[in-house]
Amino acid sequence: MRKHIDIVFSRLSGPILNPPPDNNVIPKTDRKLRITEVILRFAVVIFALVSAIMVGTASGTRDLGGGIRIHAHFTLLKTLPFLVIVDGILAVYSLLQGLRCFLSLYMRHILLNKALAWTIFCCDQALAYVIFAAAASTAETAYISEQGLDELQWIKVCMFFRAYCFKSGAGMINAFLAALCMVFVSGMSVFHLFRLYGEKRAYGHIAEQVVISEEAAERRNSLNGI
């Protein structure tokens, strides 16, 4: 049995376990996938930044007469500060991941191992859920601000601050676009993660086939000797 194991490792040590010298050559399909991920990562950065800027700078002033003025800014609705914070975190994270993906176009295995793949997978999943939750809660608050809610004596805020509501709404739309991009990015991170385990299973399958073929050859030689 030890002889078979030695044969297996001697056969696999060449083209299978030891990559060729030109290890940075990326297959065409894999390269297209990485380019798509780079585009999506930087798209998330743009959408998240636009959302944070639009919501964070939303403000308005209404003159009620008699020297009375009321002001509105993004802290008026409690969900907006949360959205701005999530947008900022998502933009920074996506920028770092976008740079990593861009470098991976030229260096095949840069910054990619199982530990990092699991970390990226968990972060992508968590941020996708968080940005979607933040955008959804903002959308609900925006609807109440537009339509009002008599049960809670919530007035139609947008009736007084049209520009404020317009900028907040634009920021909310960009947040949803960022969330949509994160859904696709999360799918890609799942693919990258489990592909690492798939390669390991492929090596094991090849080793098993080599062992079987060697055992069959030895039996044939024994029968021929008899």
Swiss-Prot record:
Task: Enumerate the subcellular locations listed in this protein's record, separating them with semicolons.
Answer: Cell membrane
Note the topology in the membrane.
Multi-pass membrane protein
Parts of the chain on the Cytoplasmic side: 1-37, 100-114, 192-226
Tell me yes or no: is Metal-binding among this UniProt entry's keywords. Answer: no
Keyword tags:
Cell membrane, Membrane, Transmembrane, Transmembrane helix
User: What's the domain of life for this entry?
Assistant: Eukaryota
Protein's name in the database: CASP-like protein 2BC1
